[in-house]
């Protein structure tokens, strides 16, 4: 029995919820079902790395129902997704807002999905800064760098001109699943799933 299998089979002390997530992990399914923070990012990054090490030829499915959260934590997840040699299919369910939208769109092109009633939010960039004048200047400079990179990537994911992303991000913008498909954040709207796990 492999070390990975051993790690998964030791379910003593797990709650019912933990056991469900462990079972899903064995099917290469992981969940982002909360606000994005460092703890959640560390867990998701570890799961992606584990599954990629187990089999680099099989897809990982990332289901997203998240209001967003920390940019740095989200970028850690994104960088790990890029680092992984396997394709990562992303699925919007419920709400994929802010960093949730970013990670949804960052999935492997052709394998980004939305459930019919999912809602996707492309947010207005926020950059509140506090502290001394010197601290504010440093924070403002860093925010400008991050904002520019987020615009670049959020334009690259759907294949939109960066000018359109900048204009559309001037205010929070919500998308239905159909609108997200038209915009390019997702490639398919799921109507049902086959027994073998393939979405349709």
Model-found features: residue ranges?
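Terminal-region recognition feature
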Residues: 1-200
